[in-house]
């Protein structure tokens, strides 16, 4: 089977959102129908995440597996030939089994655009047309309240039954203005349903002088779904960009993936400092984080130094079983080198608890 990574742009006005609704009018359903027409086989399109009805995308990422092998350029042309003119494939790449469009996401950027100048008929589907002028400087004052890790229960519509933990990390929010259009850029690994649109609505209300920027703290502290808030119109929101980890091994329960200093928004437990210290002490080595697949909890790290590789377990109960599951994939990558030594697994005390194949030349 071949795996292809695709980047798609779309204007969401005419569609029920990304996820299949069994009505045939979602972006996912349309893409699946087109690709199945080309491959003559059942295809499952998996996106980086959902966008709601009316929401746009400049660079939504999705993947699909197929027996049909074609050059990326031909795939792009073939799919676009059958798509409506408000959905367009921007890029296609062949990927290996370690790539996953949803689980390998490092962060996403959503932009919310507000026109607070004269009504613009040409941008009505991609920019919210605000009927009054907004105080941009007041809006900027609200940004620090939402950046960082907070409980966003009051600022999303995801049910507590489905998502009991509604703590999320917003990496950054920036506000720019050009020609009467305000752009709010939100960056984070993941957002709850309507979370970005509700945050945008808060900024709009501040811009209208409905309340002071400090009111955001009251909203966050309330931690309840019944707290009064609005959801800003869908057309102003665009999924702008999706960034991915380089991944060396992937399983249903975990992965070994790229690690960069400052990557604390994805590693959710206290063992992060151990990995960061190892990186500082061995700057010439390559380091990868071994994490759970969904929550990105750090269970250990993978270190490579000139053909020698080792897995260091930071949380033994789950880390050692996961390391042994991922070991064959890591071995396969090392075997592509002319010389490599066995991969050893160390526990927190520095004791070898397992190792891979015998030294090979």
Describe the role of every protein-language-model region.
Residues 1-246:
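Structured-RNA-binding interfaces characteristic of tRNA pseudouridine synthases
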Residues 23, 27, 31, 252-256, ...:
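Short N-terminal amphipathic alpha-helix/helix-capping patch enriched in small hydrophobics
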Residues 52, 263-266:
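N-terminal basic, amphipathic alpha-helical segments
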Residues 52, 275-276, 327, 331:
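Short amphipathic alpha-helical segments
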Residues 190-192, 263, 316:
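Short, surface-exposed beta-strand-loop junctions and turns on beta-sheet-rich folds
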Residues 247-260, 287-361:
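Acyl-donor (CoA/ACP) binding surface of acyl/acetyltransferases
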Residues 256-263, 271, 275:
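Hydrophobic alpha-helical core bundles mediating ligand binding, dimerization, or RNAP-core interactions
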Residues 267-287, 291-294:
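Active-site rim helix/loop that mediates acceptor-substrate recognition in acyltransferases
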């Amino acid at each position: 089977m071949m795996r292809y990574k695709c980047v798609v742009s779309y204007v969401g006005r005419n569609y029920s959102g990304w996820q299949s609704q069994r009505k045939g009018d979602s972006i996912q359903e349309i893409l699946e129908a087109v690709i199945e027409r080309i491959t003559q086989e059942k295809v499952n399109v998996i996106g980086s995440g959902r966008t709601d009805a009316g929401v746009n995308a400049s660079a939504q990422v999705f993947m699909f597996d197929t027996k049909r092998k074609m050059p990326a350029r031909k795939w792009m042309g073939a799919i676009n030939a059958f798509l409506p003119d408000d959905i367009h494939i921007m890029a296609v790449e062949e990927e290996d089994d370690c790539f996953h469009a949803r689980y390998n996401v490092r962060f996403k950027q959503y932009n919310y655009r507000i026109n607070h100048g004269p009504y613009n008929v040409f941008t009505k589907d991609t920019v919210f047309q605000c009927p009054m002028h907004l105080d941009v400087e007041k809006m900027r004052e609200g940004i620090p309240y939402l950046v960082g890790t907070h409980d966003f229960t009051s600022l999303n519509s995801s049910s507590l039954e489905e998502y009991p933990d509604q703590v999320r990390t917003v990496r950054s929010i920036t506000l720019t203005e050009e020609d009467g259009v305000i752009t709010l850029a939100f960056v984070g690994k993941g957002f709850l349903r309507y979370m970005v649109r509700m945050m945008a609505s808060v900024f709009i209300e501040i811009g209208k002088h409905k309340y002071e920027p400090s009111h955001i703290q009251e909203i966050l502290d309330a931690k309840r779904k019944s707290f009064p808030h609005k959801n800003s119109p869908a057309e102003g929101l665009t999924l702008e960009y999706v960034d991915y980890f380089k991944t060396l091994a992937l399983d249903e329960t975990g992965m070994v993936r790229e690690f960069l200093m400052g990557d604390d928004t994805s590693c959710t437990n206290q063992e992060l400092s151990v990995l960061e210290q190892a990186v500082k002490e061995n700057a010439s080595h390559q380091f990868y984080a071994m994490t759970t697949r969904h929550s990105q909890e750090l269970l250990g790290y993978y270190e490579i130094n000139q053909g020698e590789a080792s897995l260091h377990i930071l949380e033994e109960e789950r880390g050692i079983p996961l390391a042994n599951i991922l070991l064959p994939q890591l071995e396969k990558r090392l075997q592509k080198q002319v010389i490599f030594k066995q991969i050893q697994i160390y526990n927190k005390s520095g004791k070898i608890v397992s190792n891979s194949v015998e030294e090979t030349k």
